[in-house]
């Protein structure tokens, strides 16, 4: 089952921002960062290219050899099967905490190649930065934090009718008893999943097969 994540709406707004900076997406592992970036790339761009510094260790040399975005992109093109076109390709740097030079390169993409759409993601990035004494290009990136699935996102997927009802009412209106009971039930179910995407999808998919 597809869970609509609010972070993708924020990505869409960022895409249309004239003074756009690369996104640095932070968050724990297994909360859906990679899924969100790839979904955004598929839905909003002609192409998307993902470079994973954890799985593709050879990528590190590309950033160690040059700080020029033009040179970096020319070499990265050798590692993917889609063109890297400004405005048409979303460039994803995944697990960027594994390559300090790639993290630093975001500064140069901001200054010298702002026409490219770049999202970089890191797991436990704050820990890595402190432990390895890495530097984040402050002021040259838009830092975003992603969390596990919220109750709002869960309810939207699990019980669309109740979600739509809640969205349409006035905030000061008293909720009918049936809605309150439904919300309590859904919240208990949400707590069982813990907001982790795999657990939420497994629960909702299993219900669909019953």
Q: Which residues does each predicted region cover?
A:
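Phosphate-binding site recognition
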Residues: 1-210
């Amino acid at each position: 089952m597809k869970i609509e994540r609010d972070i993708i709406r924020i990505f869409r707004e960022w895409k249309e921002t004239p003074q756009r900076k690369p996104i640095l997406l932070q968050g724990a592992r297994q909360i859906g960062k990679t899924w969100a970036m790839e979904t955004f790339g598929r839905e909003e761009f002609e192409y998307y290219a993902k470079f994973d510094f954890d799985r593709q260790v050879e990528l590190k040399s590309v950033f160690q050899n040059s700080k020029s975005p033009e040179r970096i992109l020319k070499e990265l093109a050798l590692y993917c099967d889609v063109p890297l076109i400004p405005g048409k390709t979303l460039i994803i740097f995944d697990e960027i905490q594994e390559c300090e030079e790639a993290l630093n390169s975001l500064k140069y993409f901001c200054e010298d190649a702002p026409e490219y759409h770049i999202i970089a993601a890191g797991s436990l990035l704050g820990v890595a930065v402190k432990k390895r004494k890495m530097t984040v290009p402050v002021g040259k990136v838009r830092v975003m934090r992603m969390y596990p699935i919220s109750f709002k996102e869960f309810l939207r997927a699990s019980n669309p009718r109740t979600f739509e009802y809640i969205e349409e009412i006035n905030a000061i209106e008293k909720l009918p008893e049936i809605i309150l009971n439904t919300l309590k039930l859904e919240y208990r179910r949400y707590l069982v999943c813990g907001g982790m995407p795999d657990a939420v999808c497994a629960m909702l998919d299993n219900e669909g097969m019953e």
